[in-house]
């Protein structure tokens, strides 16, 4: 039985019911339906903290999904899992790949900035201010891109840019 059918969460059940109805009434190919099933199962696994299973479902959804916009969100979510697992360089790779398919993902730019800022903080702790500065500069560039797409969001990032003199 697919994971999405056995999840006890009310919202997940509601989403699954609505999604199943939509899949019946909207013309879709069998491949699109199968890709969506993997995507839905991934959401269920990820919400339960089962990242390994979520990744497997994402990779299967990527194999089946052909729409670049939908693929961008799958790639973004793979990046989220790698971020949660502390695999920052892998996460950055997936955020980049998501943005190649959909350059209007401010959350991907924000997450990339957060990773770069974190790496800058690590460099400071290791006493390497030059490397820290490079990471912080890169974080600033990503936050500027996120803010350009969604003015008014990411207030903390906006304030950090102003305080550090990186806001043009």
UniProtKB/Swiss-Prot annotation:
The keyword Plastid applies. GO terms for cellular component: plastid membrane; thylakoid membrane. Essential for the assembly of the photosystem I (PSI) complex. May act as a chaperone-like factor to guide the assembly of the PSI subunits. Keywords: Membrane, Photosynthesis, Plastid, Repeat, TPR repeat. This is Photosystem I assembly protein Ycf3. It is found in: Plastid membrane. It is a peripheral membrane protein. Belongs to the Ycf3 family. Transmembrane segments: none annotated. The keyword Plastid applies. It comes from the Eukaryota. One of its GO terms (biological process) is photosynthesis. InterPro entries: PSI_Ycf3_assembly, TPR-like_helical_dom_sf, TPR_rpt, Ycf3/AcsC/BcsC/TPR_MFPF. It comes from Cuscuta reflexa. TPR repeats lie at residues 35-68, 72-105, 120-153. Its main location: plastid. HAMAP family: Ycf3.
